[in-house]
């Protein structure tokens, strides 16, 4: 089974930072997914504006974390709890697995930031609240 983890922000951010090389901003918020014994995934949010935030998902690579309750919690935070209109994903162009995963979640390709990384470009992805299939219909306005 498993459960969403809301406590222990520092531990969650540190775990995700190790997995995906994330450099946390001061405004970072984190939730995790645990199988009861081990942390399996973390969703990070940062770069908040009135309508948007950046969203980053880190996992242990096993697939044990990819559960509907975790995806619901991950998308309910920005769209239901914070009432944001969209989330943004910033994916290194070379990270084809992450890009494929994000597109499968429903993100749309919106642009390219050339030479944004020392050895790569960044692909900009966006997901609008009304496009998010993981939150209940009444919140997709």
What kind of feature is each model-predicted range?
Residues 6-52, 62:
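Acetyl-CoA-dependent GNAT
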Residues 46-57, 83-85, 118-121:
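A conserved beta-turn-beta hairpin within the catalytic core of GNAT-like acetyltransferases
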Residues 56-66, 92:
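A short, internal acetyl-CoA/4′-phosphopantetheine-binding micro-motif in the GNAT/acyltransferase core
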Residues 66-74:
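Conserved acetyl-CoA pyrophosphate-binding loop and the N-cap/start of the following alpha-helix
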Residues 80-91:
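Conserved GNAT acetyl-CoA-binding A-motif
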Residues 90, 108-123:
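Conserved catalytic-core motifs of GNAT/GCN5-like acyltransferases
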Residues 94-111:
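Conserved active-site alpha-helix within GNAT-family acetyltransferase domains
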Residues 116-141:
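C-terminal "cap" of GNAT-fold acetyltransferases
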């Amino acid at each position: 089974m498993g459960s969403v983890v809301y406590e222990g922000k520092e531990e969650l951010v540190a775990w995700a930072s190790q997995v995906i090389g994330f450099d946390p901003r001061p405004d970072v918020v984190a939730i995790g997914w645990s199988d009861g014994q081990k942390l399996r995934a973390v969703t990070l949010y940062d770069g908040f504006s009135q309508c948007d935030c950046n969203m980053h998902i880190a996992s242990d690579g096993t697939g044990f974390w990819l559960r509907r309750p975790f995806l619901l919690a991950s998308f309910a935070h920005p769209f239901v709890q914070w009432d944001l209109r969209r989330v943004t994903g910033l994916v290194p162009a070379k990270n084809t697995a992450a890009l494929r995963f994000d597109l499968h979640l429903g993100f749309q390709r919106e642009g390219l930031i050339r030479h944004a990384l020392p050895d790569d470009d960044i692909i900009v992805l966006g997901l609008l609240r009304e496009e998010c299939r993981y939150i209940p219909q009444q919140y997709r306005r």
